[in-house]
A protein has these predicted regions:
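Long, charge-rich boundary regions
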Residues: 47-125
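Active-site neighborhoods of enzyme catalytic cores
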Residues: 8-11
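Conserved phosphate-donor/acceptor-positioning beta-strand/loop module used by diverse small-molecule
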Residues: 1-6, 161-162
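ATP-dependent carboxylate-amine ligase
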Residues: 13-18, 22-28, 33-50, 95-102, ...
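Short, flexible micro-motifs
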Residues: 4, 86, 198
Length: 263
């Protein structure tokens, strides 16, 4: 787990799920809350708390929208993807590797070779635009994706593609629990709302206070691609639910912008 800077116990964000003590049903508090309900939790009403850590991340050295550097058990590591959630994935990988006696140098070599896979910070070109595709499928994941792209030090256009097929989840009300308000903290001149539920995601974006005249709706993903190609920004982020991501990749593959394989 994370064992970075701590503070006196305090409540998690009011919109956080899964923070009820499983022993006494009191509300958990956190000495360290990384995101959602993760971190160093403690119940002030009974003895329930996070177990002692066998493997510790003690420092977040540098985090950008494309890379992350951190210290686990005294070793410096770097991964070639952004996002706090990917640091958790790396921590899990290091923990398993250490348990089986894999040397830190081998772990670092593995991280150095790893790259983003399909739909998970996958990069490609649409015309002359440098684009990144990011899968979103729930409030926590969407909020973390938004936190990640917020670290970009350049302006970018944003496209949010919302479908409601069974693989996406037919109930799209989760978008109201995701922190789309964070777009107001970013340098985003234009936003495209696409997919089967384009009007719903456009409404969610309007509610944040983002200017309505800067939001363009298009159900067809080919039209979203055309919008990205003609917009002024050199960079574009595309946040897409699962089937929207697959459909978007199919169009990209037909244009030979990405490979058809999903690896």
């Amino acid at each position: 787990g994370f064992d970075t800077e701590k503070h006196a116990p305090e409540l998690a964000h009011y919109n956080t799920e899964g923070i009820v003590c499983p022993k006494c049903e009191s509300i958990l508090q956190y000495r360290l809350n990384t995101y959602a309900n993760l971190g160093d939790y403690v119940c002030l009403n009974c003895d329930f708390h996070r177990p002692e850590l066998d493997y510790k991340l003690t420092e977040l050295t540098k985090i950008t929208n494309t890379t992350s550097e951190f210290v686990i058990d005294g070793q410096d590591y770097k991964i070639n993807v952004g996002g706090l959630y990917n640091i958790y994935n790396a921590l899990a990988a290091v923990s398993v590797a250490e348990f089986f006696g894999v040397a830190p140098e081998q772990i670092k070599a593995g991280f150095d070779k790893s790259r983003a896979v399909f739909g998970r910070q996958e990069t490609f070109k649409i015309g002359d635009k440098s684009c990144t595709l990011v899968l979103i499928k729930n409030p926590v994941g969407a909020s973390q994706a938004l936190d990640m792209i917020k670290l970009a030090d350049y302006p970018f256009s944003l496209s949010v593609l919302l479908n409601a097929n069974y693989a996406d989840g037919i109930d799209t009300s989760w978008i109201w629990d995701a922190n789309f308000e964070s777009i107001l903290e970013m340098d985003i001149p234009e936003i495209n709302a696409g997919g089967v539920r384009h009007s719903e995601i456009a409404r969610r974006l309007r509610v944040t206070g983002y200017p309505e005249e800067k939001i363009t709706q298009a159900e067809k993903l080919e039209d979203i691609m055309a919008l990205i190609e003609k917009q002024d920004c050199d960079h574009a982020y595309i946040l897409a639910t699962y089937t929207a991501m697959l459909e978007f990749r199919d169009i990209l593959a037909q244009r030979h912008a990405v490979g058809k394989e999903m690896n």
